């Protein structure tokens, strides 16, 4: 294995370790999370999702405790035949979630591995004692994690190209 390949592998591993240090709380949205309640109809929520261009939202009780998650996927199953069903009847009752202190790589893996094909994860406080899920603290979008990963990959590629250019006769432009 060449010195260049070894260096690249070491740098990639180190970069992965660096990204694991980034916490969900550093990337999540916490103030303006669009939520719903279990009493609303799927028609109301469908209209709200279209208005805000989102594909899902946390379902919370009157104390802000997350009790489920509703996605366009669930809504579409019932929209034409039962538009006035309550969200609580069709929501995901045990959705994947993350916590503010979890690393972004783990949160990203949860989104990818979810059989619900989520592009966002609710961020909850699991120390909330009364419910299985916990109090909603925010939401993290796959798009934001991908942007962060992309920025880090570009930085790493520029570093590698610079290193390669300094150690070879051939110059690579980026």
Curated annotation (Swiss-Prot):
Pfam families: CBS. SUPFAM superfamilies: CBS-domain pair. It comes from the Archaea. Methylated at an undetermined residue between Ser-2 and Asp-26. The keyword Transferase does not apply. The keyword Repeat applies. Residues 28-87, 91-156 form the CBS domain. Keywords: CBS domain, Methylation, Repeat. This is Methylated protein MJ0556. It comes from Methanocaldococcus jannaschii (strain ATCC 43067 / DSM 2661 / JAL-1 / JCM 10045 / NBRC 100440). The lineage of its organism: Archaea, Methanobacteriati, Methanobacteriota, Methanomada group, Methanococci.
């Amino acid at each position: 294995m060449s010195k260049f390949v070894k260096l690249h592998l070491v740098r990639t591993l180190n970069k992965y370790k660096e990204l694991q240090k980034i916490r969900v709380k550093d990337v999540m949205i916490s103030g303006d999370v669009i939520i719903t309640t279990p009493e609303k109809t799927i028609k109301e929520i469908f209209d709200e999702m279209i208005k805000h261009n989102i594909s899902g939202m946390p379902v919370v009780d009157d104390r802000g405790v997350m009790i489920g998650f509703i996605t366009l996927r669930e809504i579409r199953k019932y929209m034409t035949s039962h538009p006035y069903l309550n969200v609580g009847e069709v929501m995901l009752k045990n959705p994947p979630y993350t916590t503010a202190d979890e690393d972004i790589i783990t949160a990203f893996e949860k989104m990818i591995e979810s059989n619900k094909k989520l592009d966002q994860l609710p961020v909850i406080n699991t120390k909330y004692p009364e419910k299985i899920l916990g109090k909603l603290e925010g939401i993290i979008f796959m798009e934001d994690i991908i942007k962060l990963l992309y920025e880090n990959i570009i930085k790493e590629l520029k570093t590698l190209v610079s290193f390669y250019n300094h150690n070879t006769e051939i110059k690579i432009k980026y």
